[in-house]
């Protein structure tokens, strides 16, 4: 029996976020291209070395990237939009696709399945010449071999998932384009095999949600590839859910190994194996350590899983691996010594997960007695945190038990509420606003750091925040915005800020993960029962409102987003944690309202990303996600206007859910998706307040008034003007002041032009 340890992917960002800092230094011309490439190589090889030292046998190569692995694949295969043809160097083209340029919009960015990682959407254009433009996996494979003596496992995104994630083609064209991918994949795999690659991981996460016809179509492509590359050892890797519905066909694919997720797809994959077995001539790669959360594994449960598998499958060859790439977890917990012992002991970041894989390998190859001490330690750790006071609050249980049906709905329907709100708020047609945050300048970040390290006092920090708030209230008034925001200068992160002020949360010092490009986030850890403590946003919001006659929005992050952007305890259902957060936010919203705040925005940008991959599981998730939002927002008076915001999603999947949220106004990120949501609204009605983002805030370019006016014009073809709002795509925290002010001026002018046209036509 052969059993090996493997990893599917390692976090890119570096232990101290060296990767992020190198990228941003290069973009701001602080280092040249040679320095950039040299530093990136050092980081890349260090990651390989860490995995080697941890005892991982099959080390992923090619999972490292300068921005995004899907973008890497698009560039490699020649999926380069013609608008970037003026750029000649690899890095210029690559980063223009990712970030846009002065004259060209970036490629669309969207969520990687149901995670908080974002990928760059490949674009297909008519006449595109698909070919292997650059065999990057080969270069990196040879680099690891030469520099470190590591015979790694090249990792590539599979052809079917790649094309399914791309856009720009019709459904009728899909099969033809898919066949065109065979030749470059054959060349890629042939060259890797010729260079000595013992096993090549081909990621096909899309397989968890395909129809039977699609899986058969994918199989034919793999058969065509296998025919040309008969000797390459391929590991077909799935993750994020089970492949239960198509398992019977998938195990007949012409590959040597198949990787299955036994964490997020455990039940479905076990059901399929018990029904159909597993081929004796293939290796089963068992995703048994959670690659998406930060908790220590239950080693007893994992070993029980292997016992069950060994009795149900024909193969004797196994690979022990995480459920997915460790991209979604922080790198190492060793710096988190400030945490309580019970919490610290319960954590496992990427490096600890690698150690867990080696422990499991030892138990499987040498017997459980070889890790008896570790097993006992793990059992004690799990018992300690399960029985902790933080996870057993009677007040939280009582509040949950007391909930009634009327706690989940507003007193009046939208149409009647909105009329009352129009009278109270006195806003113009097509009101303008922003999504919430304004630039977190170097001065803002430095001052916050000085406050946190005790260099300046609480009072000095509060005075600084008030000064920034007043400055931006005046900017907004001068620009001519209708509904203002306080700017969120006191907040580092829209989830972390609330977590720091609620019971049940804890925070890491260095628990960073990549969100998109160089943007990293440090998700809170929800380890206990969540409960309200004190007002979280009252002081800053009320202060901002005192500075102006215009309406100032209260700004909160919604319960589902706080849930989906946190590392969540895994001992109770996510629904229950979401309800706990909603009850805490409900208290805060009531305090804002009683303090005179008449518009309150509860952002849910992550509502869509939490949806299960399989459509059959959507309804259950959407039901409790919507109920969580309603629980948080439904206790306000009819005259109080509730806003929400969403971004980067396939909204057509959740239009009904958006409607069910019963928000008075929803703002939706649309500019970067090049009008896809506008097309969705052509086929369905949305008769509540809505703002479709008129410019992409993720790019440094300042869009013209005419660009924004065009989006407004297109939007008004499908939206009722009396309910339509005009706003940017997202918050402006990451932009510079000199980018924000002219962009908002152009936006307000576009709104004025649109109002004038509507009045003329009327």
From Swiss-Prot:
Enumerate the residues binding L-methionine: 435-437, 488, 603
Asked whether the UniProt record includes Zinc among its keywords, one would answer yes
One matching Pfam family is Meth_synt_1
What enzyme category does the UniProt record give? transferase
Where's the active site on this chain?
698 (proton donor)
Record keywords: Disulfide bond included?
no
Q: In which pathway does it act?
A: Amino-acid biosynthesis; L-methionine biosynthesis via de novo pathway; L-methionine from L-homocysteine (MetE route): step 1/1
Membrane-crossing ranges are: none
The protein's UniProt keywords, in alphabetical order, are: Amino-acid biosynthesis, Metal-binding, Methionine biosynthesis, Methyltransferase, Repeat, Transferase, Zinc
Give the Gene Ontology MF terms in alphabetical order. 5-methyltetrahydropteroyltriglutamate-homocysteine S-methyltransferase activity; zinc ion binding
Q: Which reaction does it catalyse?
A: 5-methyltetrahydropteroyltri-L-glutamate + L-homocysteine = tetrahydropteroyltri-L-glutamate + L-methionine
Cofactors (names): Zn(2+)
Bound cofactor: record note: Binds 1 zinc ion per subunit.
Instruction: Tell me which domain of life the UniProt entry assigns to the organism this sequence originates from.
Output: Bacteria
**Which residues bind 5-methyltetrahydropteroyltri-L-glutamate per the record?**
17-20, 111, 519-520, 565, 609
The EC number(s) given in the record are 2.1.1.14
Per UniProt, L-homocysteine binds at 435-437, 488, 603
| GO BP terms, alphabetized | methionine biosynthetic process; methylation
Q: Which residues bind Zn(2+)?
A: 645, 647, 669, 730
Function (record text): Catalyzes the transfer of a methyl group from 5-methyltetrahydrofolate to homocysteine resulting in methionine formation.
Its family remark reads: Belongs to the vitamin-B12 independent methionine synthase family.
Indicate what this protein is called per its UniProt record: 5-methyltetrahydropteroyltriglutamate--homocysteine methyltransferase
**Which species is listed as the source?**
Bacillus cereus (strain ZK / E33L)
